[in-house]
């Protein structure tokens, strides 16, 4: 029997009491600097609260995550000397991880403001089904749709 305890999971976020926000903070974190990542995410939520007065920043965040998260993706499989792109359904944990990764990636690529402002802008765009991260999700869905013919090669 193992002496170590199992995986305890992510602690909920102390301000919004939400596990998804805590996971997002961990995704934004660089080089183990969690305080910096927490400040960036909370400042982004504050900016969303200022710009979208009638909406709760947490609801904007949730709507953005559901708009970014992919349902299907393509995976490569080698069959008889040829490599096929096979459309596969994305597991819920991977959906969230991809959404976090794309949101962080495209927020970082935005113009030269603070990271909190760039993250807030990308979240607001994603909540209204615009922005680069939503385009990335649409591109992944288009690739899966284009390769439907190879769906019978499933793993």
Curated annotation (Swiss-Prot):
InterPro entries: Ribosomal_uS7 (IPR000235), Ribosomal_uS7_bac/org-type (IPR005717), Ribosomal_uS7_dom (IPR023798), Ribosomal_uS7_dom_sf (IPR036823)
A Pfam family reported for this protein in Swiss-Prot or TrEMBL: Ribosomal_S7
Keyword Disulfide bond part of the UniProt annotation: no
One MF term in the entry's GO annotations: structural constituent of ribosome
Domain of life: Bacteria
UniProt keyword terms in alphabetical order: Ribonucleoprotein, Ribosomal protein, RNA-binding, rRNA-binding, tRNA-binding
Gene Ontology terms: cellular component: small ribosomal subunit
tRNA-binding among keywords: yes
Regions that span the bilayer: none
A single BP term in Gene Ontology: translation
Subunit (UniProt): Part of the 30S ribosomal subunit. Contacts proteins S9 and S11.
Function: One of the primary rRNA binding proteins, it binds directly to 16S rRNA where it nucleates assembly of the head domain of the 30S subunit. Is located at the subunit interface close to the decoding center, probably blocks exit of the E-site tRNA.
Family membership: Belongs to the universal ribosomal protein uS7 family.
The protein's name in its UniProt record: Small ribosomal subunit protein uS7
Natural source organism: Chlorobium luteolum (strain DSM 273 / BCRC 81028 / 2530) (Pelodictyon luteolum)
Lineage: Bacteria, Pseudomonadati, Chlorobiota, Chlorobiia, Chlorobiales
């Amino acid at each position: 029997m193992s002496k170590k305890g199992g995986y305890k999971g992510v602690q909920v976020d102390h301000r919004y009491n939400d596990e998804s926000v805590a996971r997002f903070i961990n995704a934004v974190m660089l080089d183990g600097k969690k305080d910096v990542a927490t400040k960036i995410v909370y400042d982004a939520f504050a900016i969303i609260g200022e710009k979208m007065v009638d909406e709760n920043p947490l609801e904007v965040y949730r709507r953005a995550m559901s708009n970014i998260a992919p349902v299907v993706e393509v995976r490569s499989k080698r069959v008889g000397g040829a490599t096929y792109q096979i459309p596969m359904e994305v597991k819920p944990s991977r959906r969230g991880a991809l959404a976090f990764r794309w949101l962080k990636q495209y927020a970082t690529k935005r113009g030269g403001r603070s990271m909190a402002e760039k993250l807030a802008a990308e979240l607001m765009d994603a909540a209204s089904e615009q922005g680069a991260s939503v385009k990335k999700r649409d591109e992944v869905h288009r690739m899966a749709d284009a390769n439907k013919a190879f769906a019978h090669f499933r793993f």
